């Protein structure tokens, strides 16, 4: 999250559930089998439960997935499961509360909400739960082995993602840890 925050897109500029389902149907009719709702943060949509249910009802669509920051996932998980959500990817860049607060610009309590969401999702059978971790120089590159250890005995698959070094319209690779650099 940028230090200055982000401007939210006006509601009128977002696709409605009906528009999303109409577009999804076109893709499914052309052979797409899996649709993933991503963001921003898809769980802030007030109609996300209805959207998941409508997507799940599309004939030929096998999988409805979501990528979330996990902050409100635990609160919405019952309804999402009942709507037919098949898979969850959760973004988590650190296993340390203070780093979490710094990286996300959220209170440390958010970290506990995310961990609660992870445990609840696993309890609901979303396994393997997929965790996306963006590795950033000077922030969390020292935690890669911690993530591996944390997931060793849990039904969690962690995927380490290279930081995309865009700074406005400029390329800024100061925080980037390349795949090659992480294996050296």
Where are these regions (language model features)?
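Radical SAM/AdoMet-radical enzyme domain recognition
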Residues: 14-36, 45-157
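A short, flexible beta-alpha/helix-coil linker loop
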Residues: 4-8, 97, 165-168
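Canonical Radical SAM [4Fe-4S] cluster-binding loop centered on the CxxxCxxC motif
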Residues: 1-17
